[in-house]
From Swiss-Prot:
PANTHER family: GLUTAMYL-TRNA GLN AMIDOTRANSFERASE SUBUNIT B MITOCHONDRIAL AND PROKARYOTIC PET112-RELATED (PTHR11659), GLUTAMYL-TRNA(GLN) AMIDOTRANSFERASE SUBUNIT B, MITOCHONDRIAL (PTHR11659:SF0). Belongs to the GatB/GatE family. GatB subfamily. The gene is gatB. SUPFAM superfamilies: GatB/YqeY motif (SSF89095), Glutamine synthetase/guanido kinase (SSF55931). Its EC number is 6.3.5.-. This is Aspartyl/glutamyl-tRNA(Asn/Gln) amidotransferase subunit B. One of its GO terms (biological process) is translation. It comes from Bacillus cereus (strain B4264). It catalyses: L-glutamyl-tRNA(Gln) + L-glutamine + ATP + H2O = L-glutaminyl-tRNA(Gln) + L-glutamate + ADP + phosphate + H(+); L-aspartyl-tRNA(Asn) + L-glutamine + ATP + H2O = L-asparaginyl-tRNA(Asn) + L-glutamate + ADP + phosphate + 2 H(+). The keyword Membrane does not apply.
Length: 475
């Protein structure tokens, strides 16, 4: 029996508003526990919520960027459940009239493009955060009432790789809109995954498992990969899949049962009595649409068409708005687009990944990188020397020209000076000359290495090759 995998994702994104969705409480991350709450957030008797218009604008902006249809009439509902981090015993969410529906984004895996549907995007308030210790449980209500959008995908993904690509693309689009920073480590982007298997050709979905507590895109992919194998093994051996909630454990590289779900949750939704229905007219929609900046796909196409970048470069550079904006500022300052792309995708990304940092955390600036790239273009420094300059720029900042002068890194491009060095090296390596003339191409590499060593890596490589061949041919 051949089985196919069905994957759908539910993503919660915290909106970057200055106040909470139904109160004036601040939203700063990292504040002391329970210092950013109010009687409205905690559901004291007699208090009434007031809808934050900026949260609605942000939700509309995200929905439009995800190609959703925007509702003309929408409303809020009470989702009833009891849990210590939910002091009101209900959550204000949206049930049957979400703010956005029928959206999609396009992903690419192994060179193949695929459209993933988005069922709905709705607004809701976040819950508090529980911390469990040996002495008991603690609850921080700072997060209670934070504005969230929940983005529910269609079950259109067939592999864990597609799920990873979907999350990467979704995060990129949301970051470009500016409505959220999507930092998983701070909880501003959270994901639950639903996965089931069914025989190829069957229309009915199999019984799904829900994966929770997935705190990175890599964990989402790994969790789905393990769950895919677990369910396949169970089904092929004649077993049945139970509807379960599971979590991915990095230590064991397995998904672990959290609880069995005997039926669907009954949250007894009913319309929120303290909030009126919301009507969104065309004028409001168009005002929000006009605020949407250039999104990653459009920017990627522009890089290829106008800057002549390869599609791969354009894809990597536009994955995050931070990197793309840095690239644009560097090129706008006069640097060559392709050379800038090479440095950002190579040395810069390697450094950031190794140090676990973002561009905003390092001393490198677009102006600094631009000036360094232009020094390479002019032949003032070689790419090899530029790495020494780069290390200084990204660690301490500064002016590339001043760094080159202070460290004596100016490339030697004077033909007379280089010819003298080449002649001296050849005089001391006659055997290498003979080896080269006898077809041993490695000999030329050895000679170039000796010249670079003698000039402390500052010789102009193309000029060295030219002079070296000229001098060898004279002998």
């Amino acid at each position: 029996m051949n089985l196919e995998t069905i994957i759908g994702l539910e993503v919660h994104v915290e909106l970057k508003t200055n106040s909470k969705i139904f109160s004036a409480s601040p939203t700063e991350f990292g504040a002391e526990p329970n210092t950013q709450t109010s009687v409205i957030d905690l559901g004291y008797p007699g208090v009434l919520p007031t809808l934050n218009k900026e949260a609605v604008n942000f939700a509309m902006k995200a929905a439009m960027a995800l190609n959703c249809d925007i509702a003309t009439e929408t409303k809020f509902d009470r989702k009833n459940y009891f849990y210590p981090d939910n002091p009101k015993a209900y959550q204000i969410s949206q049930f049957d009239k979400p703010i956005g529906e029928n959206g999609w984004i396009e992903i690419e895996v192994d060179g193949k493009k695929k459209r993933i549907g988005i069922t709905r995007l709705h607004l809701e308030e976040d819950a508090g955060k529980s911390t469990h210790t040996a002495d008991g449980s603690l609850v921080d209500y700072n997060r209670q009432g934070m504005p969230l959008i929940e983005i529910v995908s269609e079950p259109d993904m067939r592999t864990p790789e597609e799920a990873y690509a979907y999350l990467e693309k979704l995060k990129s689009i949301i970051q470009y809109t500016g409505v959220s920073d999507c930092k998983m480590e701070e909880g501003s982007l959270r994901c639950d995954a639903n996965i089931s298997l069914r025989p190829v050709g069957q229309e009915k979905f199999g019984t799904k498992a829900e994966l929770k507590n997935l705190n990175s895109f890599t964990y989402v992919q790994k969790g789905l990969e393990h769950e895919q194998v677990r369910q396949e093994k169970e089904l092929l051996s004649g077993g049945i899949i139970q509807q379960e909630t599971r979590r991915y454990d990095e230590a064991t590289k397995k998904t672990i049962l959290m609880r069995v779900k005997e039926g669907s949750d009954d949250y007894r939704y009913f319309p929120e009595p303290d909030l009126v229905e919301l009507y969104i007219d065309d004028e409001w929609k168009e005002a929000v649409r006009a605020s949407i900046p250039e999104l990653p796909d459009a920017r990627k196409a522009r890089y290829v068409a106008e800057l002549g970048l390869p599609a791969y470069d354009a894809h990597v550079l536009t994955l995050t708005k931070e990197m793309s904006d840095f690239f644009e500022a560097t090129v706008a300052d006069g640097a060559d687009a392709k050379l800038t792309s090479n440095w950002l995708m190579g040395e810069v990304l390697a450094y950031l990944n190794k140090q676990q940092k973002e561009l905003k955390d390092v001393a490198l600036t677009p102006a600094g990188l631009s000036k360094m790239v232009q020094l390479i273009e002019k032949g003032t420094i070689s790419s090899k020397i530029a790495k020494k300059v780069f290390n200084e720029l990204i660690e301490k900042g500064g002016d590339p020209e001043e760094i080159v002068k202070a460290k004596g890194l100016v490339q030697i491009s004077d033909e007379g000076t280089l010819r003298k060095v080449v002649t001296e090296i050849l005089d001391n390596n006659e055997q290498s000359i003979e080896d080269f003339k006898n077809g041993k191409d490695r000999a030329i590499g050895f000679l170039v290495g000796q010249i670079m060593k003698a000039t402390k890596g500052q010789a102009n490589p193309p000029l060295v090759n030219k002079i070296l061949l000229e001098e060898i041919n004279k002998r």
